[in-house]
Amino acid sequence: MHLEIYITDQCANCQEAVVIAEQAGGIVGLEVTVVNLDAPGQRVPAQVFAVPTYVLNGMVISLGNPERDGFLAGLRAELAHRSEERAK
């Protein structure tokens, strides 16, 4: 699974998004990318119209920061479910 978190430099809530990204990066099987839309040459995807925006496998799952612990638990549960499905 791939989680992309879109931020900007001037976003007041994006520091929390970076913290969430750092913690999510420790989840086995999850690739996490923080995309700073202020970086030179960075394109803004059509589905991103606010920051922070969380995109999981190409699908927007949160506009704004989700509640951290619940969000991370949900990611772990989804990965565990996918792992179980593959094992069948």
Regions found by a protein language model. Give the residues of each.
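Local sequence-structure signature of Cys/Sec-based thiol-disulfide redox active-site neighborhoods
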Residues: M1-G25
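Terminal leader/tail segments of proteins
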Residues: H2-L3, N13, L30-D38, A77-K88
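Conserved short-loop catalytic and cofactor-binding motifs
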Residues: I5, D9, Q42, M59
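Non-catalytic interaction surface on structured domains
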Residues: N13, A21, G29-E31, G70-L72
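Generic recognition of short, well-ordered alpha-helical segments
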Residues: Q15-V19, A46, P66
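Thioredoxin-like thiol-disulfide oxidoreductase module
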Residues: L30-A50, V55
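Non-catalytic, surface beta->alpha helical segment in thiol-disulfide oxidoreductase systems
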Residues: V55-A87
